[in-house]
């Protein structure tokens, strides 16, 4: 595990962070995904060569709205999904297509190169070709080519490991240089310092491990702010298989005195149930638009930190 080796950084503060889940359902049948991967050669296979089942893909994406200390709002997208048809539906359902057209979304932050977070890029760029895109600097040539062939005409920012990257007051990104299944390298996540509350982190899949991520935030952001909340995939039990070795993750989260846990996507419903049993403050949802349970923040749901 290679994480940023950094000195404490002042990332500033913001008033609040609102996250609207556009889609956390990256696929609709987990067994089919596993079968696709197995047929292609296993978890070390290049994702770009897997013959994915055409009707099983969805995507992961969220709209993030940050209120600055002066009351102004900044909007950006966290990830851009997978299946273009599914993402088109999600964007139109939530009005993201209009926000992109009107220039009200500032940038796209792609957590990592996995297909369900990145391959829906053509839909996003259809509405805003000049949108600024932030990625890690560990993308393979296929990922770079996808950006080009998707019609991107804006600025591409590549963030590397070794330091926290201040994006705007109250918000910073941290990149972990780690190998990930399906031949992906590197993932980064976001930290927000919310005035009067503490640190909030937003993740894609959190392949770096949620405790590693939260440790980095607590130790490397000036002022020793406490952890307040988190949103996103935590990759604890993505295919609903629980093992005893995962128990310390739940205990570790419980020890942090978090105030809001809005985990979804690859966290796993079984992990959500373990969190609830451990009295973690899990934010629940409405189980609509394809999300499978009301026990977590799902498609079309919002959470405010």
Describe the predicted segments one by one.
Residues 15-17, 21-29:
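Short polar catalytic/cofactor-binding loops
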Residues 25-29, 34-94, 187-203:
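Conserved beta-strand hairpin/beta-sheet module of binuclear metal-dependent hydrolase folds
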Residues 64, 79, 91, 112, ...:
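Divalent metal-coordination and catalytic microenvironments
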Residues 73-76, 106-107, 130-132, 199-200, ...:
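Short active-site oxyanion
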Residues 85-134, 221-231:
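Active-site metal-binding motif and surrounding structural segment of the metallo-beta-lactamase
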Residues 90, 120-124, 146, 213-216, ...:
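A short acidic, amphipathic alpha-helical/loop segment
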Residues 113-115, 191, 196-201, 205-296:
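Cap/insert and terminal regions of metallo-dependent hydrolase folds
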Residues 135-188, 284-304:
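Metallo-beta-lactamase
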């Amino acid at each position: 595990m290679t994480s940023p080796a950094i000195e404490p950084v002042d990332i500033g503060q913001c008033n609040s962070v609102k996250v609207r889940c556009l889609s956390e359902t990256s696929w609709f049948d987990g067994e089919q995904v596993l079968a696709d991967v197995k047929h292609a050669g296993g978890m070390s296979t290049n994702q770009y060569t897997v013959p994915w089942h055409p009707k099983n893909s969805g995507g992961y994406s969220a709209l993030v709205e940050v209120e600055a200390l002066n009351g102004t709002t900044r909007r950006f997208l966290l990830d851009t999904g997978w299946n273009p048809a599914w993402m088109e539906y999600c964007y139109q359902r939530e009005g993201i297509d209009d926000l992109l057209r009107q220039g009200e979304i500032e940038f796209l932050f792609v957590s990592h190169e996995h297909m369900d977070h990145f391959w829906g890029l053509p839909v996003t760029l259809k509405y805003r070709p000049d949108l600024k895109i932030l990625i890690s600097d560990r993308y393979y040539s296929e990922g770079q080519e996808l950006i080009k062939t998707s019609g991107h005409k804006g600025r591409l920012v590549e963030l590397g490991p070794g330091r926290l990257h201040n994006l705007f007051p109250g918000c910073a990104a941290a990149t972990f240089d780690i190998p990930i299944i399906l031949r992906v390298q590197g993932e980064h996540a976001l930290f927000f310092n919310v005035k009067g509350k503490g640190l909030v982190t937003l993740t894609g899949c959190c392949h770096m491990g949620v405790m590693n991520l939260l440790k980095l935030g607590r130790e490397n952001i000036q002022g020793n702010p406490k952890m307040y909340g988190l949103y996103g995939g935590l990759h604890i039990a993505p295919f609903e298989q629980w093992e005893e070795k995962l128990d310390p993750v739940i205990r570790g989260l419980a020890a942090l005195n978090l105030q809001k846990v809005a985990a979804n996507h690859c966290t796993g419903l079984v992990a959500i149930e373990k969190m609830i049993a451990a009295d973690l403050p899990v934010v629940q949802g409405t189980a609509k638009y394809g999300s499978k349970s009301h026990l977590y923040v799902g498609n079309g749901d919002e959470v405010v930190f």
